[in-house]
Structure formats: C-alpha cells, structure tokens
A protein has these predicted regions:
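Substrate-binding/active-site clefts of carbohydrate-active enzymes
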Residues: 1-32, 39-155, 160, 182-188, ...
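A structural motif
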Residues: 31, 163, 212-213
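Hydrophobic faces of well-ordered beta-strands that scaffold small-molecule active sites
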Residues: 34-36, 79-81, 166, 195-197, ...
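Active-site-proximal helices and loops of the catalytic beta/alpha 8
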Residues: 69, 75, 99, 153-155, ...
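Rossmann-like NAD(P)-binding element
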Residues: 142, 165-166
Length: 258
C-alpha cells in the first residue's frame, strides 16, 4: 500500500501519511477499525522486528503514526496493531549484542542459544529460528526480562498511539500462559482492549478459555473462501464450512471488525 522497499535502508520516508488521503473513503465504507500489519522497524518484511518502539523508517516516524491514529480515532475508527512476540529479526538490538559479545552478552538468555553449535549464517553459535527460518530469531519468553520488555513495548503503543487492540502473530506458537498474561496486562490499561490471535485449524480450545483472548482468527475460513471463489464451487459448501467452524466455538461472540 505504501510502496516501501523490501529492505530497510534506514532512510526515513513519510509514506504512512498517505492514509490521510483515504480517511473519507474509510468512513464512507462504514469501517470501524483498521488493522495494521507490522509498522515497527524491521530488517525486511515487518515480522523481523528491530525495534518495538520505533515506526519503520520506510513508512515514517512515530509522530507520523500518532497523527494517523488520532485522525482515525477522530472518525470513530479503532486501531489494531500486529504484535510479533514470538520472534525478532537478526537486527534486533539484543541479538546484535549476542553476535558481538557471545557468551558475555547480557542478552544471551533472551534467546535459545547453543554456543557449541553453529547457525546457517555461520555465526559461531546455534540459535532457534521460528519454524526453521533463521532470519526470525525465537525469543525466550520464559525469561522475565523478555516478558518485561515486551509488556513495556505494549504500554508504549497504548500510551503513545492510543491503540485499541493487538493481533497476535503466530498465536499458535505462543505459550498460553504468555497470552493470558498479556491479556490481563492490556485489560488493566484498557478495559475493552481487543485481542485477536492467529490460529491454525480448530480454534475452539483457545476461544473457549476464560484466560485467553476471546477472538482468534483461523486460516480455515480464508483458505476455504479463496478456493470456493476461485473454483466457482457451490456457495452452500462454503457456508457449511463457516457454520461448522462457528459451531466449534459456540458461546463466543463474533467481533465486529471491518
């Protein structure tokens, strides 16, 4: 949408301000919430975070995003951000410190590292990458300092941008206790804070839990919708699939998010 380059060259371009030109259009559509893919500084595609508290240079500055969020709120639209808490990019400050200081790094326990091994990047140590993607360095969410860092980042998002919700990237990879902790933390900041988790397959085990966020996305609906439309298959089959997914999560209210 913003036309930003794939690689982050560190040059600030105020592309996010283009959204101001679409405010009237969004309002005419009756949209009541905007969900943003990752907006924070990253190495490449947004899901490889460098800095959780700095808007990506390729789309603008924190001040730019504050302006966008205020304009959306003034028009009655809520703001939902993509929260990538399972992994970071290799450019993340703590991982860079490990690369430079190895065993002496104060951040070495922020990740799951074996200094007797090696990585595909020939770092001289092995670390766990998300699902074998070593450009995505898995965080050690069991470490209290990692938890505090991520929660403080969320606090900043709420305080600076007044966001209304978070979509949890790869929620199926996150420990349930972490999501429960995050939910409680966010609800203390904002009682009606919205949480949406990315789940593969059956999401009933998540959505029925009182401790977890009540809203979970499922790729089943997206995959089914795409294939029914692409193949011009009878629409009643698509409706039946959605009904089955809805029945598996009975008792959970649907969120009105456009």
């Amino acid at each position: 949408f913003c036309g930003a380059p794939h690689d982050n060259d560190g040059i600030v371009e105020h592309r996010i301000l283009r959204l101001n030109d679409f405010m009237d259009y969004f309002e005419d559509l009756g949209i009541n919430a905007i969900y943003f893919n990752p907006v924070f500084s990253s190495d490449h595609h947004g899901y490889d975070t460098r800095d959780y508290c700095k808007i990506d240079e390729r789309i603008g500055t924190n001040e730019d995003f504050i302006e966008i969020c205020k304009n959306l709120h003034d028009r009655g639209m809520r703001v939902v951000l993509d929260g990538v808490f399972n992994h970071v990019g290799r450019g993340f400050f703590a991982f860079q410190d490990v690369l430079n200081n190895r065993e002496n790094s104060q951040y070495k326990d922020w990740f799951r590292i074996d200094f007797n091994g090696n990585s595909p990047y020939d770092d001289g140590f092995y670390y766990e990458g998300w699902e074998g993607h070593y450009e995505l360095v898995k965080l050690n969410l069991d470490h209290p300092d990692v938890q505090n860092y991520l929660l403080s980042a969320v606090d900043y998002w709420i305080d600076a941008f007044d966001i209304d919700g978070i979509r949890l990237d790869v929620a199926y990879s996150l420990p349930r206790w972490f999501m429960a902790m995050l939910k409680d933390h966010c609800r203390q900041k904002k009682a009606d804070f919205f949480l949406l988790g990315e789940v593969l397959g059956d999401n009933a085990g998540y959505s029925r839990s009182e401790k977890l966020p009540k809203s979970f996305s499922t790729r089943d609906i997206r995959y089914t919708s795409y294939n029914r439309i692409r193949t011009h298959t009878r629409p009643e089959r698509h409706i039946n699939t959605i009904y089955m997914i809805h029945q598996s999560s009975r008792g959970v209210k649907s969120a009105r998010l456009v």
